[in-house]
């Protein structure tokens, strides 16, 4: 950033009309502004709940964009049609990878409607407490992937003695086995090699089932776009993120949904979202959630404060406010309709 005018000591530094810090000293016009001369301090935010809210003008159904999607029995629509091999713990990761790796493009050539066979593994699931928020989060994540519309079928593998018991995980999610959602326990089938063989056999049985689902023309209103920052630098808020924001506005106008995830990434600029919240109550939920994060991180080594990672700083971001400002631009200018508090 370059100072556009003379900036007096302790004056507010604004980016996109949002305060990202204060001048450490008198700074002449033309001076580079970065972490060496921008001081991070607490800024009183004007949430102005719902002041700028405008209902989105949706296109009539007959004018909305379409795409070729896979329609699922429950009404969800997928953009891909994978068979997923998931794990209850890291103990089953090798088995999951070996099963998935068996299905090369050549072996899948006879099933053109199958996007692939892919492993979803984790380093967790064993050597951790059996109850509490971390196990709950792991289970919701695994079963969330298993039931994602982009999976036409899923096999969840487990060693059998891990802390994340596979039966408990299914029960926690309120799910039962079916033709397209199966359990595979390594100890029950006789070890790693036999589990790989059994997994391959099951996938071979699932391939014609999943392949029977074909793409069809559907409205863009079925699309759900998840937004996440990655590798932020000084240009993210000028290029990639605003471009995503524009795409979000177009998607919502066509009846679709966008989710601005990782609420910690908007710390310090949440007032730019509360102003366009559908109701003051929705805006307050966002503020409450940011405050929850601040409380949750007390005493931990991952404080939400003014610092950014060395890579972010080297890339041109002075502090977390500037990073958050760029990250929030992924949400476009569409109204904030709801805040999900489940983490």
List PLM regions with ranges.
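Alpha/propeptide regions of enzymes that mature by internal proteolysis
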Residues: 9, 14-22, 26-28, 32-34, ...
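Short, Lys/Arg- and Gly-enriched loop/turn segments at beta-strand edges
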Residues: 29-32, 41-48
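A generic local secondary-structure boundary/capping motif
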Residues: 22-24, 70-76, 142-146, 211-217, ...
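Flexible inter-domain linker/hinge segments
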Residues: 47-84, 207-212
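Short, well-ordered, mixed-charge alpha-helical segments that flank or form enzyme active sites
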Residues: 42, 162-166, 190-194, 232-236, ...
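Anaerobic metallocofactor- and corrinoid-dependent redox/one-carbon enzyme cores
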Residues: 66, 73-92, 96-97, 103, ...
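Single conserved hydrophobic/aromatic residue that forms the stacking wall/gate
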Residues: 1-8, 13, 343
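Terminal amphipathic helices with adjacent charged low-complexity linkers/tails
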Residues: 42, 171, 183, 267-268, ...
